[in-house]
């Protein structure tokens, strides 16, 4: 068995019926010629008779109240693989409604925590694969890599593969900090979380120093280098979920146009997309008579995976990033966000990997504290979670079926009701919006505002757009 590290454990301890902590993503394929009726059943049969590699063969085993491990088992593929078909005409609206419904329920902890749905009967002879995986089992970048690994760049490859079949690599040994109380670390008191950072293994000498440094910044005893919790202004986006219902939306921007804009302004693709998101959020607030006079703050996970990207679990740090001023012009907003992300990266480079993970745990805990305690709920740590993942740039296939669409269904975090995740897929930059309806009940409008923000940024920066963006709302 493999002991579960604190970040992975937090996704289990924080999960509630109204706040699932699984990730989900779907891929849509155009069925190969001559296989319109047979491709789905063949895929279902192959998946039901497949074997799962790590981490998809890991089942949760509790060793105590706040201690858990992954136990290697042989999954019951009959349970994990489901096949369903949409009734005619199989419209995209029907598909999105089905996906939203399937993504609502919690994953069964009596099995390895993942499910796969083959969704047949989509208009224009298409078929989809929806994968749900618990965030404790794998992080977003690892999940995207798993989705990439089961696809081929050759239309002649006839292998009926699934994301769980190819091993994600042997789990690297990771030291596990001393057990921290569930109540103190994850649901209760900020003081308990800070003390928890000092209880790491004795060999990790730099972590305590980093924790003390953060504390000194919080007390204004030295200049701030890190963004600290409980400093964001509460907005509509901090209305938390009352049920498991979620609202989703999707935006696709031409990747070439995004890269051209980043190059012309001396920034990055990440900065450009954050600017588009930030501008859209401020306009959404204004439309709902809920404008803020301070910059919005983004909670940004940052991958600590090495280039091989192997292994399950979560290998991430995080940072709180203040974005642009509410009234800033598009280019001014981009410059402000570029400066903020540069500071975040510079700070991260100066911290040990373990220190960065401990800092991420502190920030994650601060979101939970704000969600649980009314007083601190008025001073949230962040207004939105924004994640950037790198996807494939080449055309991919599943047994000769070309990939035509991809979208994630982001987790809605504690303390904030909105999560925006983006990834580059082929020639598109796909932005996925996941929200509690209490925070964003019109994801389609937010998607439209992102499209408009991108066009306005291009216009002010002096770049042209030979292509157009698209938006969808499940």
Swiss-Prot record:
Induction remarks: Expression is controlled by VirS. Induced at acidic pH and in macrophages. Induced by low levels of nitric oxide (NO), but not by hypoxia.
Q: Name one GO molecular function term.
A: diacylglycerol O-acyltransferase activity
Activity-pH behavior: Optimum pH is 6.5-7.2.
Report the pathway entry: Glycerolipid metabolism; triacylglycerol biosynthesis
* Recorded GO CC terms: plasma membrane
Q: Name one GO biological process term.
A: response to acidic pH
* Function per UniProt: Required for maintaining the appropriate mycolic acid composition and permeability of the envelope on its exposure to acidic pH. Upon expression in E.coli functions as a triacylglycerol synthase, making triacylglycerol (TG) from diolein and long-chain fatty acyl-CoA. Has very weak wax synthase activity, incorporating palmityl alcohol into wax esters in the presence of palmitoyl-CoA.
The cross-references to PANTHER family, in alphabetical order and at most eight, read: O-ACYLTRANSFERASE (WSD1-LIKE) FAMILY PROTEIN (PTHR31650), WAX ESTER SYNTHASE_DIACYLGLYCEROL ACYLTRANSFERASE 4-RELATED (PTHR31650:SF1)
The name of this protein is Probable diacyglycerol O-acyltransferase Tgs4
Q: Which organism is it from?
A: Mycobacterium tuberculosis (strain ATCC 25618 / H37Rv)
């Amino acid at each position: 068995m493999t002991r579960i590290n604190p970040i992975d454990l937090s996704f289990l301890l924080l999960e509630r019926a109204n706040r699932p902590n699984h990730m989900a993503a779907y891929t849509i394929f155009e069925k190969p010629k001559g296989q319109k009726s047979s491709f789905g059943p063949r895929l279902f049969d192959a998946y039901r008779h497949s074997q799962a590699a790590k981490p998809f063969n890991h089942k949760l085993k509790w060793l105590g109240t706040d201690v858990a491990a992954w136990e290697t088992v042989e999954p019951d593929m009959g349970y994990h693989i489901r096949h369903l078909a949409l009734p005619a005409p199989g419209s995209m609206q029907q598909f999105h409604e089905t996906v939203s419904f399937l993504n609502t329920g919690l994953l069964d902890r009596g099995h390895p925590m993942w499910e796969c749905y083959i969704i047949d009967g989509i208009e224009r002879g298409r078929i989809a694969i929806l994968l749900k995986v618990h965030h404790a089992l794998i992080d977003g970048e690892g999940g995207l890599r798993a989705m990439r690994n089961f696809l081929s760049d050759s239309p002649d490859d006839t292998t009926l593969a699934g994301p769980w079949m190819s091993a994600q690599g042997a789990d690297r040994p990771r030291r596990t900090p001393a057990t921290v109380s569930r109540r103190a670390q994850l649901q209760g008191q900020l003081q308990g979380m800070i003390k928890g950072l000092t209880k790491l293994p004795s060999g990790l000498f730099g972590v305590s120093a980093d924790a003390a440094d953060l504390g000194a910044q919080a007390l204004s005893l030295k200049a701030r280098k890190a963004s600290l919790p409980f400093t964001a202004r509460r907005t509509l986006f901090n209305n938390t979920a009352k049920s498991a219902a979620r609202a989703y939306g999707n935006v696709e921007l031409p990747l070439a146009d995004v890269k051209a804009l980043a190059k012309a302004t001396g920034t990055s693709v990440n900065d450009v997309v954050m600017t588009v998101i930030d501008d859209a959020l401020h306009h959404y607030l204004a439309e709902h008579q809920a404008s803020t006079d301070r910059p919005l703050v983004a909670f940004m996970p940052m991958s600590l995976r090495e280039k091989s990207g192997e292994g399950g679990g979560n290998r991430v740090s995080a940072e709180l990033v203040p974005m642009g001023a509410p009234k800033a012009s598009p280019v001014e907003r981009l410059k402000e966000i570029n400066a903020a992300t540069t500071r975040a990266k510079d700070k991260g480079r100066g911290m040990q990997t373990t220190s960065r993970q401990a800092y991420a745990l502190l920030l994650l805990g601060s979101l939970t504290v704000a969600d649980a305690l009314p007083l601190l709920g008025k001073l949230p740590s962040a207004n939105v979670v924004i994640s950037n993942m790198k996807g494939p740039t080449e055309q991919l296939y599943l047994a000769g079926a070309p990939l035509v669409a991809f979208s994630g269904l982001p987790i809605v975090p504690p303390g904030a009701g909105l999560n925006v995740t983006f990834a580059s897929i082929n020639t598109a930059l796909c932005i996925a919006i996941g929200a509690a309806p209490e925070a964003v009940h019109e994801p389609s409008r937010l998607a439209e505002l992102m499209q408009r923000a991108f066009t306005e940024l291009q216009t002010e920066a002096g770049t042209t757009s030979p292509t157009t963006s698209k938006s969808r709302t499940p």
